């Protein structure tokens, strides 16, 4: 039944529709740090809710594909999507100064870790040696969190591989969601630009070990194993 009582004022509705960061900056400019802090905290959770919804949606969709069409369709699905989205990004990344990508990848993982909020929050460290930067996620903000949150458990859990594939890092019972990394990070970039864009190693034990990505200062130093696991050789 309709009501004549308003739930919010026009100003309140206007504020709800503004970017939270803009409101936080405005609060700082107005000398209101408490409101700015509150808005910054709210913004972390705004992104996490959307992030987790999309991650679980992707996990559910690829699980459905494997269940209904078979595991060979998993490869076809990832390839189809990446050709239409990720390929152009890989080519752009390869064109940028490699030092700049370290900062961009760190920003990506800050976002993907959803600012460390929510249950089993994402977290990562970065280290540097003479040849590369190592990003260690423990847990990563999506695939590993799904496992630690129990999203693969029970009758309605997400799917895992029934067989070992090169795109499941030679492992059976491997989380289907995480197989996208084989295609996005290694297999398809090798086909597009000649080398893996983000050579990576998934956790051995998802409950304990990190997921590790590498960014080499010179792509020529990327170890051959990141080709060989797919039956390929560096060129």
Question: PLM features: what roles do these ranges have?
Answer:
Residues 1-210, 217-235:
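N-terminal accessory segment detector
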């Amino acid at each position: 039944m309709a009501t004549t009582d308003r739930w919010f004022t026009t100003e309140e509705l206007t504020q709800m529709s503004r970017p939270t960061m803009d409101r936080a900056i405005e609060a700082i400019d107005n000398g209101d740090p408490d409101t700015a802090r509150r808005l910054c905290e709210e913004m972390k959770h705004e992104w996490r809710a959307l992030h987790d919804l999309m991650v679980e949606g992707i996990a559910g969709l690829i699980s459905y594909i494997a269940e209904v069409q078979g595991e060979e369709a998993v490869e076809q699905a990832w390839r189809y999507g990446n050709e239409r989205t990720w390929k152009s990004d890989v080519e752009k990344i390869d064109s940028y100064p490699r030092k700049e990508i370290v900062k961009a990848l760190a920003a990506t993982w800050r976002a993907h870790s959803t600012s460390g909020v929510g249950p089993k929050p994402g977290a990562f460290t970065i280290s540097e040696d003479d040849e590369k930067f190592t990003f260690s996620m423990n847990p990563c903000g999506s695939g590993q969190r799904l496992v630690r949150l129990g999203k693969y458990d029970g009758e309605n859990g997400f799917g895992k591989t029934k067989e070992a594939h090169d795109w499941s890092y030679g492992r059976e019972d491997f989380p289907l969601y995480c197989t996208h990394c084989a295609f996005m990070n290694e297999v398809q970039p090798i086909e597009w630009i000649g080398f893996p864009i983000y050579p990576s190693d998934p956790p051995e034990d998802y409950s304990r070990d990190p997921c590790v990505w590498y960014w080499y200062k010179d792509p020529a130093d990327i170890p051959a194993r990141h080709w060989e696991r797919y039956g390929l050789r560096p060129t």
